[in-house]
């Protein structure tokens, strides 16, 4: 089923986004004073109308079209392993240089105190 996330289509996410936005606006407008407070009613009924229109007039058919089996081919197989070999060589070379720097770090003699 194309265009689905977690087994549901885009319409469910549109309705969820609509109702989250409406409830957030209702909470914000309920704290307002004057005539703006009563706009919550119109906002709620507008969301009900939009939801009913989206539910009563679906775009897709009731039965989904049969899916065509897609054959997955890895076109970048060789390039991926060349890149892996190149990055592994860079990593090992860097590790070698760090260890050489660690082993060959000079140790300076501490000065003797002369009394």
UniProtKB/Swiss-Prot annotation:
Subcellular location: Membrane; Cell projection, Cilium
Membrane topology: Multi-pass membrane protein
Primary localisation category: membrane
Outcome reported for the amino acid change (mutating residue 9 to V): In JBTS39; uncertain significance
Effect of residue 37 to S: In JBTS39; fails to rescue the ciliopathy phenotype in a zebrafish disease model
GO cellular component: cilium; membrane
Illness: TMEM218 mutations result in ciliary dysfunction leading to a broad spectrum of disorders, collectively termed ciliopathies. Overlapping clinical features include retinal degeneration, renal cystic disease, skeletal abnormalities, fibrosis of various organ, and a complex range of anatomical and functional defects of the central and peripheral nervous system. The ciliopathy range of diseases includes Meckel-Gruber syndrome, Bardet-Biedl syndrome, Joubert syndrome, and nephronophtisis among others.
Protein's name according to its UniProt entry: Transmembrane protein 218
Source organism (scientific name): Homo sapiens
């Amino acid at each position: 089923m194309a265009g689905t996330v977690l087994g549901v289509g885009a319409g469910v996410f549109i309705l969820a986004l609509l109702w989250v936005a409406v409830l957030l606006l209702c909470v914000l407008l309920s704290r307002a004073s004057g005539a703006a407070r009563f706009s919550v009613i119109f906002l709620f009924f507008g969301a009900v109308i939009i939801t009913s229109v989206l539910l009563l007039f679906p775009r897709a058919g009731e039965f989904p079209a049969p899916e065509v089996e897609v054959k997955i081919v890895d076109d970048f197989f060789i390039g991926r392993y060349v890149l892996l070999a190149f990055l592994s060589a860079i990593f090992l070379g860097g590790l070698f240089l760090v260890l050489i720097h660690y082993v060959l770090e000079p140790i300076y003699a501490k000065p003797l105190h002369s009394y």
